[in-house]
UniProtKB/Swiss-Prot annotation:
Phosphorylated. Phosphorylation at Ser-135 and Ser-137 mediates the interaction with spliceosome proteins. The keyword Mitochondrion does not apply. Belongs to the RSRP family. It is found in: Nucleus. GO terms for cellular component: nucleus. One of its GO terms (biological process) is spliceosomal complex assembly. This is Arginine/serine-rich protein 1. Residues 271-293 have a biased composition (Polar residues).
Length: 320
């Protein structure tokens, strides 16, 4: 029994094994088919992309050649600016639109937006110099200290008026150094030297005081100047006397007398007579005829308050 049952079981087991392997084969075939289809689709999409690129490149080349030919045919025609591309023509100021019955103009909303866009983009970072920039320590005003006030010129412009700069004050040092010492004349120096001599002699109790070498040099220079001036005066006098002869000396004295006679008025003699009342000698009293007057206080009747009578203590007590 055991031998008969074993081959039947084996046959059933084999069938079961083959039945289990069948779906795995189907899945493998399905996966292979899907992979092949995906590869074919990828290749087809890649080919379509490459074909599109080739078409766009060829069309761009043809359009560029056509545009170049058209630009060459025209006389330097300016290309129009697209919305995305930034061009120089867009940075120009927008045209003004005037009203029908007024002198003033009103910009349209498009032009105002363009103007704002233009001013935002045209402003450069180096518009203001370092001198105008804001510093943390100083005030927030961008103007320098010597620019004060502004004058309105146009819509977007202002001109700053420059205030006059003050001239710097001359520096005055309070210290009396050698470079800026007090200038004294020779006479003032002499006076100060004599005062210093007298004070030193009184303090030390010495009559003849020896001066230092610096002051001695000054005294020696003064003595030399005095001697030279006196010698020059004597030489000039001697030279003048030697040049003149004795006849010229006598003639010079006579000329001096004549000059004095011409310049001085002539004196007239006064004649005294009884008829001439003006030219009479004065009848002034002599010393012998003059009388000596006494003081008014000494004479009793010439006193200002009359005679004063002394009153004793006994008389004042009796009256009471």
């Amino acid at each position: 029994m055991k031998t008969e049952a074993s081959p039947g079981r084996l046959h059933e087991d084999v069938k079961l094994i083959f039945d289990k392997k069948a779906p795995s084969g189907r899945s493998s075939s399905c996966s292979s088919s899907s992979s092949s289809s995906s590869g074919s689709s990828y290749s087809s999409s890649r080919g379509s992309r490459s074909s599109r690129r080739s078409r766009t490149s060829s069309s761009s080349r043809s359009s560029s050649s056509g545009s170049s030919s058209s630009s060459n045919s025209r006389s330097r025609s300016r290309p129009r600016c697209s919305g995305r591309v930034h061009c120089r023509h867009r940075h120009r100021s927008p045209p003004r639109r005037y009203r029908a019955r007024s002198r003033s103009y009103s910009p349209s909303p498009e032009s105002s937006s363009r103007r704002r866009h233009y001013y935002r983009r045209s402003r450069s970072p180096y518009r203001y110099s370092r001198r105008y920039r804001r510093s943390p320590s100083r005030s927030r005003s961008r103007s320098p200290p010597h620019w004060r006030g502004s004058r309105f010129i146009g819509r977007y412009r202002c001109r700053f008026s420059q205030s006059p700069r003050r001239s710097p004050r001359p520096y005055r040092s309070r210290s009396r150094s050698r470079e800026r010492s007090i200038r004294l004349s020779l006479e003032e120096k002499k006076y100060l030297l004599n005062v210093a001599k007298a004070n030193a002699a009184r303090i030390l109790g010495v009559q003849n005081l020896e001066l230092p070498e610096s002051l001695k040099e000054m005294e020696q220079q003064e003595e030399r100047k005095r001697r030279s001036s006196s010698d020059e005066e004597e030489r000039v006098r001697v030279d003048l006397a030697a040049q003149k002869t004795p006849a010229q000396v006598n003639g010079g004295a006579a000329d001096d007398e004549a000059e004095t006679a011409q310049t001085s008025p002539k004196r007239k003699q006064i004649v005294f007579s009884n008829n001439n009342a003006i030219a009479k000698p004065s009848s002034s009293p002599t010393l012998s005829d003059s009388k000596v007057t006494s003081r008014a206080d000494i004479v009793p009747y010439k006193r200002p308050f009359g005679q004063w009578v002394p009153i004793g203590k006994s008389s004042s007590a009796n009256k009471r």
